[in-house]
Each structure stands twice: as structure tokens, then as C-alpha cells.
């Protein structure tokens, strides 16, 4: 795990951010987010989800209850909201590039860009 040397915080990778966004998006439709629903959303295995959830819990971005329900902490929710704001801004800017994209393609591209930006550039 890399540390952000200036702040002593653990670095968040693209994968971490994709999981946080997926948990946030699932939680919009249901109160109880499960490992299975995360695996389905991301198209990954349950063991992969378990490994990532442990990493996110170590970063205090989520909690997992005894019976498997997953919830974002305040810090996890704040991270998801920041990413969501950046995605919305990118969704507005991408069409200005003059390339024809469908709404779904714009959303996917905006998400990909938002999670790929360096830690310093994550606020678009």
C-alpha cells in the first residue's frame, strides 16, 4: 500500500474508487448492499470483493456488518460524492469535444476519467 507522504493517508487506486462508486450507486436503490451485489455490479468474483472490502475497511471508507451488509462511512460517502460531482462535470464537458457519444458512453467515459485522475487532480 502506498501512502500519500504529505498527509500520511493511504493512496486510493482506480480499483478502490470503482468499488466506492459501485457501493454508492447500489445504495441509491437499496439500503442493504451485499458483497454479492457488488460482485454483480462490477463483474468480479466474490473473493475479489472480499479482498477489496478489507482494503477499504482498513482505509476507514466502509464498514461491513456481521451478516455481510456493507455501508460507506462518512469518509467513504464523501469520496463517492466528490467522484460523482467530478463525473457530472465531465459529462458536461465531454460533448464539447465535438465527438459523438451516446449518453451511456459519456457516463462510462466520465467515470473512467474521474477514477483515473491523479490524487492531486481528482477535483475537476
Q: What are the functions of these language-model segments?
A:
Residues 68-86:
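Basic, amphipathic "hinge/linker" alpha-helix immediately C-terminal to the N-terminal HTH DNA-binding motif
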Residues 13, 72-75, 118:
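Residue-level signal for threonine
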Residues 3-44:
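N-terminal helix-turn-helix DNA-binding core of bacterial DNA-binding proteins
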Residues 53-54:
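Short, hydrophobic-biased segments on the C-terminal half of alpha helices
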Residues 50:
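Conserved catalytic core of two-component sensor histidine kinases
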Residues 47:
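Key DNA-contact positions within bacterial/archaeal DNA-binding proteins
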Residues 88-124:
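Amphipathic alpha-helical dimerization/coiled-coil segments
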Residues 57-67:
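A short, conserved structural fragment
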Amino acid at each position: 500500500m502506498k501512502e500519500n507522504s504529505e498527509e500520511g493517508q493511504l493512496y486510493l487506486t482506480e480499483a478502490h474508487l470503482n468499488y466506492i462508486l459501485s457501493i454508492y450507486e447500489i445504495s441509491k436503490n437499496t439500503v442493504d448492499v451485499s458483497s454479492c451485489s457488488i460482485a454483480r455490479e462490477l463483474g468480479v468474483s466474490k473473493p475479489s470483493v472480499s479482498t477489496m472490502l478489507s482494503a477499504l475497511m482498513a482505509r476507514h471508507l466502509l464498514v461491513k456488518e456481521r451478516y455481510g451488509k456493507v455501508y460507506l462511512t462518512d469518509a467513504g460517502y464523501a469520496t463517492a460524492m466528490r467522484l460523482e460531482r467530478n463525473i457530472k462535470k465531465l459529462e458536461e464537458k465531454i460533448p464539447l469535444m465535438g465527438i459523438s457519444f451516446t449518453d451511456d458512453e459519456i457516463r462510462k467515459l466520465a467515470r473512467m476519467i474521474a477514477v483515473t485522475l491523479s490524487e492531486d487532480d481528482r477535483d475537476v
